[in-house]
Curated annotation (Swiss-Prot):
InterPro entries: Formate_THF_ligase, Formate_THF_ligase_CS, P-loop_NTPase. Pathway: One-carbon metabolism; tetrahydrofolate interconversion. This is Formate--tetrahydrofolate ligase. The keyword Translocase does not apply. ATP binds at residues 73-80. The keyword Ligase applies. Keywords: ATP-binding, Ligase, Nucleotide-binding, One-carbon metabolism. HAMAP family: FTHFS. It comes from Arthrobacter sp. (strain FB24). The gene is fhs. It holds the Pfam family FTHFS. Its EC number is 6.3.4.3.
Amino acid sequence: MSDNNVMSDLEIAQRATMRPIGDIAAAAGINADAVELYGRYKAKIDPAKLIDPAGAPKRLPGKVVLVSAMSPTPAGEGKSTTTVGLADSLARAGRNVMIALREPSLGPVLGMKGGATGGGYSQVLPMEEINLHFTGDFHAITSANNALMALVDNHIFQGNELNIDPRRMTFKRVLDMNDRSLREVIIGLGGPAQGVPRQDGFDITVASEIMAVFCLATDIADLRARLGRITFGYTYDREPVTVADLGVQGALTMLLRDAIKPNLVQTIAGTPALVHGGPFANIAHGCNSLIATQTARRLADIVVTEAGFGADLGAEKFMDIKARVAGVAPSAVVLVATVRALKMHGGVAKDRLQEPNVEALAAGSANLRRHIRNVEKFGITPVVAVNKFATDTPEELDWLLEWCAGEGVQAAVADVWGRGGGGDGGDELAAKVLAALEAPHSFRHLYPLELSVEDKIRTIVQEMYGADGVDFSVPALKRLAEIEKNGWAGMPVCMAKTQYSFSDDATRLGAPKGFTVHVRDLIPKTGAGFIVALTGAVMTMPGLPKVPAALRMDVDDTGKPLGLF
């Protein structure tokens, strides 16, 4: 227990009583034939084996509640905590609810975050296993990615029948770890028997196109088709080369055949949760797997899900990428805001965020206002969830609620860290979300797919970020020409941008104006079905911080994890 006698997330999770996952599945209406046990408290669900109870009336798919946030502090603002707490409160109100979340990436767990399963009494369990290797999905995705690149390099070594140009590879090997030293490497050294030397590099697994394909596939057949469409490089004639050209989409699908099934776990309060897939929202599309979301909608009346980082990133990608693939457009959106994030955007230094400062709240409110207006552009008025921290004062919370009312949006303080787990800390938020679910709305995408790639990017940076315009580098302009030539311009755009600012400069907080977003490169993800626009200095292989969270982690003499926050 910590020095202030407040239990850590890990201590709370380890003291919680879990129900056997078979009981959770049965209570959620999942037939036993569809449940594949991974120990006592985890299971995979095979959607192909799900059956409706005999004699039960055909039910409509569940409504989606999307949880997003204002621009975060480095520690995050508690989207997962709020997602879990909200779902528990909806279940407490008698609603048939299920959660759909992303799986944590090991790199950030050992780096900055220390864990990513919610917090306090609003967590998904078993916390340690989910945060570490879970059911092995990320291992399978990493293996499929690296198998592809081993097969590509072997093809080049064995005679290169496809005429692949090693200088024009667009696909990298991956590792589920933050490791800056692997961003740029040279492979194939050591003589003729060791392969063809070429420049290469590693991305983090969550940035892999196979992760994106995994999370956007509708079933295993669609997964196989999407894998086949992946472009991994170009020929010497500058023609794209795909996985199908190499003929290994079947082998990659085989490596993912178990991983593609969603993982079932539970919250501290016993609410069922599907935790599956995990692309980052700053360098990928930031949403859990579509299969998990659709499975949850089949089983529950309300599905509470989240999209990574702020609404300018994860929520925009949910609306413009994920919701285009299948009918998962949200019926309600929750924007998580915190007093500390508003203060940071109001100019307060990180080491003084715990000090009361209503004036800084007012100065930082422009950031939250822009996120509110952004969500409204999709035809939905958000509900603001004020995620309460122990250092928040009543005056600060009252000011923020009054400010939200002045902006014309419903808001509620969510005390789900300390009063979650089936407690009443999220009851007011749940009531406002239920009202929002019944309110009329008219969902719309931010842009039509018929727009040019330049105009799609311009629309996003002007409408979502508040930028004056966009500047394309010379390499990006060359890539635009390739995209047009190859018939890929009809795909949506996935912006890769810092999560800390509306701009591509992480230091410009609040709601900056008078800036230009700089696109340094464009990467067509033809399997996933979107074009990644790399902006600013955002990296697809992060580095570890100066003091990694791993330094606080250990196990006791029984092997029980310590220090996972």
